[in-house]
Structure formats: structure tokens, C-alpha cells
């Protein structure tokens, strides 16, 4: 899950996207006979004011965003729970949720971290939703074991080059099967130095900063089906948000 903060006043759009995503996940789970669901939120849940262009386009302040996105995800997890034996949630903060510009910001102080804290309290009565099933290496990465294989989760803002794969394995202090990331606003599956790299897209797609920097983004998420041998299948989940919004002919003059 990435970029669900209602930073453009589009909370209803994101809610409908999450509902569509939920249906896709359930259909895929039924097709493959899936037992457990691992939800990884790899950052940028909250849109802070890290760039002037983002600050201008944010229509909701960060407090409204934290409450709004936390409620969206808690509803999403609660609706997933009847369809799986266990739901495991893991997260790492993204660069969009930092409090200051990159050169001044601490990697240990990001607004995304408040979302998981909120979710734990909100969903404490759901016995099959777990938040402590992963190992936090530091505030920028975590490890989650799925069917005997270790998956390393990062946001990706520190890990853009192929050479970082070996560095991440060294920091994990164990062989890593796959690296899960986000950051670049589109889905991508690759294999680098024998390690799978799985990058998930963004509910938002492109923000004003992406447009200005000519950074490609697509409104999409990713579902992976994992077995004891690793990733058996993956699915691109694309969203056409034009179907969620009033068309020009539907808007009263």
C-alpha cells in the first residue's frame, strides 16, 4: 500500500480504489487458495510539506491526513480479515512523510510511523490481524519471513542503485530472497545480483513534484502470491480513477 494520503481532497476516490483493490486481492486469493495475507505499507502514506510544490497541492493538513489514511487502512484491513486465516501488517516510513527537507530531516522521525500506531489501537480486537510479525532492522528497513524466505522491506529513497542490493543484504545479516520497495510511483519486478526486487506503485500516481521532475508514475498497486519456493505469481492492479470522478457532463453549471 502506497500513497493513500488524501492530500488532494480525494479521500472518496482513494476509498473506492481501496475497495477495488480489496476485491482484486480476494479474487486472487480464491484463485490460488491463499491462507494468509501479508500487507506491506512501504511509505508515503502521509504527504508532508517536503517540497514547495507538494506543500501547495496538499489540501489537507498532516493531522487530517494521519486520521484519514489511518481510518482508510483500518477499514481495508478489517474487511480483509474474514477472508484469511491471518493478516500480517508491516510498514516502513517514506520520504514524503518526513518533517523537513532531506538534508535536515532525521530518518528516525517520519509521520508514516504514526499510522501503524493508530492501526494497532484501532484494530486491537481483531484476533487475526497482527502488527508484530516482522523484524525491524532500523527505522528505514524491516525483514518479514514468508513461507521460510526472508523479504526485506524498504521505502527506496536510500536504495535507488543496483549496488545497494549487496549493502542491504549485509545490513540484514542474512541471505535475502527479495527486496520490497516503493518510492518511484510504478510497479516493477526485477532480479539484481540473484535477489528479486519488487517495487509497488502508487494510489496517487503522479504528484506535482513528479510532473516537474519528469518522474513517471502510474496509479497502481501490486499483489504477489508467495509459496515455500518464493514468488509464484504477481499481479499488476491498475486503477482508472476517471471512473470515480464526476465527468464534465455530470457537473452542474
Per-range role (PLM):
Residues 87-95, 130-140:
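Acidic carboxylate-rich catalytic motifs and surrounding loops in phosphoryl-/glycosyl-chemistry enzymes
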